[in-house]
């Protein structure tokens, strides 16, 4: 029996010279209307802010039909979770942790001290956020990899206090694979709460039944569905957030030298995440485009998540973009600003060097997106929906605050006093200059008047 053919759209830009604005309008892009769920999520956030842990558990019962015995997962439950995993899964998690830690440790910036003039020193200090809440979603798949991608950078940044929140499953606790990942990472504070109510509880904190304090966090990170994203938006005046993440997306920039079978596999792999996932092929080869679509039609129906894949690949957010040449493809890729961008061209490194807008760039056939999803060492929490044009993925830097420390002595202040006084007068703020004059015109080294 022949399976239905994918409705993989095709946009032909050949013979045209679209502007950046036109490209952004014409390239495949799904819509995630966070505003549409704000009326649903705002009452949840309000209820948790007022009612704390009890309200969060009641909301979880209402939506998911599960109520854990407590918000905080007992240590013995976390410890026991590792024993539920097969040895190869434990080994895979440990290898992924090792690689992600190696990279994120190496990229932690050092403090930098600069003497901008004699007697004038400015230092940039990198100070970790004190307490962070990391969300690990449930839903279509279990994501221990998201625990790794959030926890490791925070640890390497030096965050003192970490809590992971993840929705309870049928047994009343988060999925054992998520708990096992927490154990392997040394995270001992896990909350069995999910959805928008988890974000609100992380932001506002509470006193749990029995008197245990659920301390609020300073920052919330991690992926989630549209309701989690809306809760992040509503709580961002209380806590910092990493981003408002939309459905996952992959763009592949390829020429006729690319392997159609491998590209088809890669486009399908991201489509299995979500029915709204975007899979886009940008190419100057119509022959390659035809081959990739044919391969996807041959393969999608035998994947475990075939219905989800078919809906994602047939959605308005997915399709082929035909361009005149790779230079035009680069312009299209930069206008699109993909979460994940694979480069399959003869000069893949040269092309990659010209990409300015992408959450992560994967060079060549041996660097596929699934590698980055799990164990390349890079992070898989990346900007979506075109926000790679101005935002970065999660990393050690996400959990560090850059603080400038100004340390001038008398010589340094006198050397720049006239500049400050002149500028303050020019802006109509003379008191600023007077604060300088008070130190340079009458002060001696003891700070007393001459």
Swiss-Prot record:
PANTHER family: HISTIDINE BIOSYNTHESIS TRIFUNCTIONAL PROTEIN (PTHR21256:SF2), HISTIDINOL DEHYDROGENASE HDH (PTHR21256). It holds the Pfam family Histidinol_dh. Catalyzes the sequential NAD-dependent oxidations of L-histidinol to L-histidinaldehyde and then to L-histidine. Keywords: Amino-acid biosynthesis, Histidine biosynthesis, Metal-binding, NAD, Oxidoreductase, Zinc. InterPro entries: Ald_DH/histidinol_DH, Histidinol_DH_CS, Histidinol_DH_monofunct, Hstdl_DH. Zn(2+) binds at residues 270, 273, 373, 432. Substrate binds at residues 248, 270, 273, 340, 373, 427, 432. GO terms for molecular function: histidinol dehydrogenase activity; NAD binding; zinc ion binding. Binds 1 zinc ion per subunit. Its cofactor is Zn(2+). The keyword Zinc applies. It is an enzyme of class 1 (oxidoreductase). CDD domains: Histidinol_dh (cd06572). It catalyses: L-histidinol + 2 NAD(+) + H2O = L-histidine + 2 NADH + 3 H(+). One of its GO terms (cellular component) is cytosol. Its EC number is 1.1.1.23. Pathway: Amino-acid biosynthesis; L-histidine biosynthesis; L-histidine from 5-phospho-alpha-D-ribose 1-diphosphate: step 9/9. The keyword Transferase does not apply. Belongs to the histidinol dehydrogenase family. The active site is at residues 339-340. GO terms for biological process: L-histidine biosynthetic process. NAD(+) binds at residues 135, 197, 225. This is Histidinol dehydrogenase.
